[in-house]
A protein has these predicted regions:
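C-terminal polymerase-core module
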Residues: 560-567, 571-623, 790-838, 842, ...
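Short alpha-helix plus adjacent loop in nuclease-associated cores
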Residues: 18, 72-86, 143-173, 229-231, ...
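Function-dense linear segments that define catalytic or interfacial modules
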Residues: 380-383, 412, 416, 450-481, ...
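Extended two-metal-dependent nuclease catalytic cores across DNA- and RNA-processing enzymes
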Residues: 2-3, 22-26, 75-253
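Conserved catalytic core of nucleic-acid polymerases
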Residues: 484-485, 541, 597, 639, ...
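Conserved "right-hand" nucleotidyltransferase catalytic core of DNA-directed polymerases
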Residues: 235-391, 487-678, 691, 697, ...
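Conserved RNase H-like, two-metal-ion catalytic cores of nucleic-acid enzymes
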Residues: 5-6, 16-55, 71-72, 76-83, ...
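Active-site palm subdomain of RNA-directed nucleic acid polymerases
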Residues: 516-528, 532, 852, 856-877, ...
Length: 925
């Protein structure tokens, strides 16, 4: 059997991969999609070909012999996109790490190097596969040289294969004649001129008949159509030059030895160096290809399990005065890597369940919440002192907690502190013996502040980013097993996993602290985010009462209206169909009923909300469909969905997330209470199902127009500041100024439009976006925005300054120092850059508002406790705080909310709040 060589056109495949795969970046901000796509294509080819030799050719950015012949050669090509250009050296680094031979030489294109190597290898009896997205290489095809052209699609990579026979079948010319076709028709991508007036069809017909441009010229008077004859006579010299430009040099002056490209087996590419680079680039899906293990960290040799009380006592005593990292290993019900990156469950969703053994009866001071058992405690206080203290009958959780509380370490670092506070018994107390808020450090929150645009912060990423360590992930070690199952089935891997959690916390605390200080976010971390961990933990523990009966009643009312709408829609359509099927709905609306503006896609007509919103005012069936969608969403998500989250204590215990949004806003999951509808009355009615406990009321405080007030302060615009200081209706004031009409004559519509402009400006709205919101022309919207900036000139200067600063620094900051990186600003894609500019304008405003709300939450939470009140902060939704208030404490709680929320930040305008009380959340709002 003949030996086989695979040749890859480096730049071509990188370029194809970059367009086939959406932009990806790793935590360093490096664009990686082209490299990732290239590797997937290469692995696919190698698995299919199983070659004996492998070589990748790259272009060199200097003129070739073709440029000397024709200065305009490739002159019309756009420069390589910055995102792709950045990845070329990364690609070469990866290939070298794999031991792949790379060829490149000044004066030649990669095509010439590939052609030369392919022909030499064919002559030596080697079968050749050339992989490229460039069809120019089809001229190389023979019975022994196969051209493979990959197409990257969402469903995977498809490859077209061409030997000489396939070229002839598809293009009606031989591979060598393919050059002549290109010489006649030209090539706009390479700026090869060709012959004017001769396109692909005519060129193919001429060459198929005469075999070459030279022979065609001999028979020039016979050429059809006559225009081709005339033009070839006139431009024959250009045709010959075009042929030279299009011809791949198969005798390039390169020193290439086939033996140097030898590949014993494909698995030889999966080197340790390449593995580490894949880890760095965060190609998690590719790591499974590597049989190599992650390089062993020397700390692993010192991972140890402690089972005896005496040994545990000695170990905890040794922590005194040292910096340590720890991790409380929870009893998990399930492990979902997507929702809990570090594998911790939401402990508050089932806090009312009784515990067994010696923990039974131990209660938190604030309520009926028992301190739960845990599997054990991992602690690291040095490179050689990393232990997992396992809980058992001989060494119960109570004893471990007691020893840990008295350890008197200098500092305690951990990953994702909030879920561990319950096991430590630190809810509402903020301390456990010698462990307190002051000496605790949450590495996950620190990593989030330093790079808030990541999706998750698993321990292996934190280790890599802040300690330069490449370590095995939880998934690598124990797959999808819970900790309890892993301890039973994979004890060694389990020990590594939990010890790494503690070790990474210990190892990365100092570099994280240094980076926080260097970036000016130390105060943000210490004074806002760390106290918030305790605030949120207490709120999760408290939860909020949800009436299953009220939710059912609400759902039943929705069901009646949904049934009415369904019948009405069928009647209007003249037939029954699946209203929830976009395909069927599109056919009904745009074919049967012939509604205008139907946008047909590959899967059918678009029935997206923006399409239907424009039709609803004129077509009752569309208005009914929109209402139907709204009500079915309310029923499934809230009326039916929320019931599943009611715990045994009758409360819903949502999980608040501190490390999800790039702006610093909080989010919540299981369930998401941030999205409780507010715009429509039917949505607001859901709040009736949320109740205070007996003898209590809800007191709700909501910041009024906080983002606009922040904008007034940050921009320093005197008119906006004056309007707020005079307690004017800001939207009516804006309408009066923008539309040049007296304040008292502003109509409701004008006020509504001004409100859309006011809030739109905060989010960097474009004239197109505003035109869509207000159903006006783009020109009118642009005029509104222009007049707005004329009215408030300093706002325009401020927003422009934010964009300029972001372009220079790569990030923007809030009033409290929170950073928001904006990689989109360096994109070559206009839409991405425009999106980046909107982020630059909005993030400092939205982020500052988020910081203020967090400060207010901490202050309200702490003051309720400090004053010994029974009332508790239980929920936050955007700019709103909800306190479950003892009836006799209502006035005091109102006072606390007003003082602490007003005082959360000192702005040039007052932070106003609206405070209401009620017997359910609806009434309180």
């Amino acid at each position: 059997m003949s030996e086989k060589l695979v040749l890859i056109d480096g730049h071509s495949i990188l370029n194809r991969a970059s367009f086939g795969i959406p932009d990806l970046t790793n935590s360093e901000g490096l664009h990686t999609n082209a490299v990732y796509g290239f590797l997937n294509i290469m692995f696919k080819i190698l698995e299919e070909e199983q070659p004996d030799y492998l070589t990748v050719a790259f272009d060199v950015s200097e003129p070739t012999f073709r440029h000397k012949m024709f200065a305009e050669y490739k002159g019309t090509r756009k420069p390589m996109a910055a995102e792709l250009k950045q990845q070329v050296p990364l690609m070469k680094e990866m290939l070298r790490a794999m031991g792949v031979t790379i060829v490149e030489k000044g004066g030649y294109e990669a095509d010439d190097l590939l052609g030369t190597i392919a022909k030499r290898s064919e002559a030596a009896g080697v079968e050749v596969a050339v992989v490229s997205g460039d069809r120019d290489l089809l001229q190389l095809a023979t019975d022994h040289i196969k051209i493979r052209i990959p197409k990257t699609k969402r469903t995977g990579t498809e490859i077209e294969d061409y030997n000489a026979k396939e070229v002839l079948e598809k293009y009606q010319v031989t591979p060598t004649e393919f050059i002549d076709v290109k010489a006649l028709m030209g090539d706009t991508s390479d700026n090869i001129p060709g012959v004017p007036g001769i396109g692909e069809k005519t060129a193919t017909a001429i060459i198929a008949k005469y075999g070459s441009i030279e022979n065609a010229y001999v028979h020039v008077d016979e050429l059809k159509p006559p225009r081709a004859s005339t033009n070839l006579k006139e431009h024959y010299d250009m045709a010959q030059m075009s042929k030279t430009l299009a011809t791949i040099d198969i005798d390039a002056d390169i020193a290439y030895k086939l033996a140097d490209a030898h590949l014993e087996q494909v698995s030889d590419l999966y080197t340790e160096e390449a593995y580490l680079l894949c880890k760095r680039l965060e190609f998690k899906n590719l790591l499974g290809r590597f049989s190599v293990e992650a390089p062993k960290n020397t700390a692993e040799e010192h991972f140890k399990k402690i089972e005896k009380a005496q040994e545990a006592e000695a170990f905890f005593a040794s922590l005194r005065g040292k910096a340590c990292g720890f991790y409380v290993v929870p009893q998990e019900e399930t492990h979902d890597a997507h929702t809990e990156a570090d594998g911790q469950m939401n402990l508050f969703g089932s806090f009312a369940m009784q515990n067994s053994g010696e923990e039974a009866g131990q209660q938190e001071t604030a309520g009926s919440c028992h301190i739960p058992d845990f599997l054990g405690l991992a602690v690291a206080c040095g490179e050689e002192e990393i232990c997992y203290v396992e809980a058992s009958e001989a060494l119960p959780c109570r004893k471990i907690r007691e020893l840990f509380a008295g350890s008197a370490a200098a500092s305690y670092a951990t990953l994702d502190l909030k879920p561990q506070l319950k096991e430590l018994g630190m809810l509402e107390k903020k301390c456990l013996g010698t462990i307190s808020e002051e000496n605790l450090f949450d590495n996950t929150i620190a990593a989030y502040l330093l790079n808030p645009i990541k999706n998750e912060y698993p321990y292996e990423d934190i280790a890599k980013d802040y300690a330069g360590l490449m370590i095995s992930s939880r998934k690598d070690l124990i797959e999808k097993l819970t900790y309890e199952k892993a301890a039973e089935k994979k004890p060694e891997e389990f020990l590594k996993c939990v010890c790494y959690m503690a070790y990474v916390a210990y190892k990365t605390r100092e570099p994280l602290e240094k980076e926080l200080a260097d970036t000016g976010m130390e105060a943000l971390f210490r004074e806002i985010e760390m106290p918030l961990v305790f605030t949120l933990a207490d709120m999760e523990k408290e939860g909020i009462i949800a009436s299953g009966e009220a939710l059912k009643e609400y759902g039943d009312k929705l069901a009646v209206r949904i049934d009415e709408l369904e019948r009405k829609i069928y009647e209007e359509a003249g037939e029954e169909f699946n209203i929830n099927s976009p395909k069927q709905l599109g056919v009904i609306l745009f074919e049967k009923l012939s509604l205008p503006n139907g946008k047909k896609t590959k899967t059918g007509y678009s029935t997206a909300a923006d399409v239907l919103d424009r039709l609803a005012p004129d077509y009752p069936i569309v208005a009914d469909i929109l209402e139907y969608r709204q009500l079915t969403k309310l029923k499934s998500t809230y009326a039916d969905g929320l019931v599943n989250y009611i715990a045994e204590d009758g409360r819903i215990h949502t999980s608040f997330n501190q490390t999800i949004t790039a702006t610093g806003r909080l989010s919540s999951t299981e369930p998401n209470l941030q999205n409780i509808p507010m715009r429509i009355e039917l949505g607001r009615l859901i709040r009736k199902a949320f109740l205070p406990k007996s003898g209590f009321v809800f007191v709700d405080a909501d910041y009024s127009q906080i983002e606009l007030r922040v904008l007034a302060h940050l921009s320093g615009d005197e008119k906006l500041i004056e309007a707020y200081r005079n307690a004017q209706d800001i939207h009516r004031t804006t309408a009066s100024q923008v539309f040049h009409i007296p304040f008292d004559e502003v109509t409701d519509l004008q006020r509504r439009n001004a409100k859309a402009v006011n809030f739109g400006i905060v989010y960097g709205i474009s004239s197109f976006g505003l035109s869509q919101d207000l159903s006006i022309t783009k020109k009118e919207a642009a005029e509104y925005i222009e007049r707005y900036f004329e009215t408030y000139p300093k706002i325009k200067g401020y927003l422009d300054g934010l964009v300029a600063e972001a372009k220079e620094k790569g990030y923007v900051t809030t009033m409290f120092g929170r950073r928001r990186p904006i990689p989109e600003l360096s994109s070559s894609n206009f839409m991405q850059r425009s999106f980046g500019e909107r982020i630059a304008m909005n993030s400092p405003i939205q982020g500052t508002a988020a910081d203020i709300i967090k400060i207010a939450m901490n202050r309200v939470h702490d003051r309720l406790l400090a004053e010994g009140l029974k009332s508790r902060l239980i929920l936050t939704v955007h700019d709103e705080l909800l306190v479950e208030t003892a009836a006799e404490e209502e006035q005091e709680v109102r006072k606390i909310l007003a003082e602490e929320m007003h005082g959360a930040a000192q702005l040039s305008v007052m932070l106003e709040i609206d405070v209401h009380a009620g017997s359910d959340w609806y009434q309180a709002k």
